[in-house]
Amino acid sequence: ISVITSAIEHEAILDNLAQLKRRGFTVDILKPGTHGVIEPGTLDAAMGDDVALVSIMFANNETGAVQPVGELAQIAHSHGSYFHTDAIQGYLHAPIDVSVLRVDALSLAGHKVGASVASGALFLRRGVPFEPLIRGGGQEAGRRAGTQDVRSALGLAAVARTLYPRLDEDHARVLSLSGCLYERLLESPRIHATLPDLVHTDRLPGIASILVDGCESEELILQLDVRGFCVSAGSACSSGSTDASHVLTAMGIPRERAAGSLRISFDDRVREQDLNAFADALLDLTGGARS
């Protein structure tokens, strides 16, 4: 039995698939193009009769690149396979419609949208087989045993009711602001967009991913922290790791360049003056704008 995923997935996917591989499954890992996207043709070429599941994220948590999930799911279905997408980074930050994407399973979490870190949800299309990891009392329709965290579930529902009606408005506003941030940062000859083709489109609006020449991410993070700004070198879930980002290296970015990566993330509460203040600080640290 085979499972197909991508090299840019979160460790929550990759580590669990590594465990399946140790138990005898075949796991094929697809590489993205230099623009950070898994091409439909790449998946189609990898499909076979023994592929039970394809799992490709909706949008990358480091670069913000949105994947062509609808097309990828269609390819998986044409070969008789199920399709799952990790939509945790994109939920309530970009339009997501399971009736359009036609995925069989979609996972999301509350901590990315201001809800409890204990909250999350799973969309499972009717008829898709499911075996629970935690067995016991049969809660949640037998899908996850244990007393339900009602408070966290209600919190996630409240956040969804608040943010969903204004999703399109917030998406457009934050995308415009982050585009302006990129323009400010790229004034420096030492700062480059990780995905220059996606600066103004096809990405999550609240993530800016850059590469800084001649700088170590760790030093920049410390210097920015002193100035009141919190950024990361890659996934926020990998804080403390000194390894180059597996996402960036999978895209073909050399390790020495990936060592100078920064991930700047923000939500719909961000103000233009906040981003300008950050840009001023980083430009000062990297020697200023082009003359």
Identify the residue ranges that each predicted region occupies.
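Pyridoxal 5′-phosphate
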Residues: I1-S291
